[in-house]
């Protein structure tokens, strides 16, 4: 596996999430946020076998992210990593990482506000999501990790 800039902060991120419920990870495009973070956290003890749900703003990005994550594991989409987008879904009984779009997450929250069985919710590309805060002070109490290229 090729080394990416994000790799240097992953241990600190794992440690922080053992002690806190939230964190913000900032890194430039191509640093490895989408492809490395879910895989690095998959075996975290605090997840206790629960699912990681990663929100992507677009269907194409959700599918591509799932394909890349599955490829990194040497698997096909629908095994450990799957996706749910409008009119298409590839998940299975062993799926532990689900890449979803906003509409899918919204419907899931309406049906299950507590997100039963979900141990981690990742907002990828947070700045382009329609509900992202326009005021950065809203996120000021979150632990932020920065990665430089």
Description of each model-found segment:
Residues 15-16, 21-140:
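Conserved P-loop/Walker A NTP-binding site and adjacent catalytic elements of P-loop NTPases
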Residues 2-19:
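N-terminal pre-P-loop "Q-motif" helix
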């Amino acid at each position: 596996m090729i080394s990416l800039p994000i790799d240097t902060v992953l241990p600190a991120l794992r440690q922080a999430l053992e002690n806190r419920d939230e964190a913000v990870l900032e890194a430039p495009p191509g640093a490895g946020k989408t492809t490395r973070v879910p895989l690095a956290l998959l075996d975290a003890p605090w997840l206790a076998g629960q699912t990681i749900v990663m929100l992507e703003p677009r269907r194409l990005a959700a599918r591509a992210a799932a394909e890349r994550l599955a490829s990194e594991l040497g698997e096909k989409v629908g095994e450990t990593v799957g996706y749910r987008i409008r009119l298409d879904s590839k998940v299975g009984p062993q799926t532990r990482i689900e890449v979803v779009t906003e509409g899918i997450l919204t419907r899931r929250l309406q049906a299950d506000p507590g997100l039963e069985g979900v141990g981690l919710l990742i907002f990828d590309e947070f700045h382009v999501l329609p509900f992202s805060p326009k005021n950065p002070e809203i996120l000021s109490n979150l632990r932020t990790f920065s990665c430089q290229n």
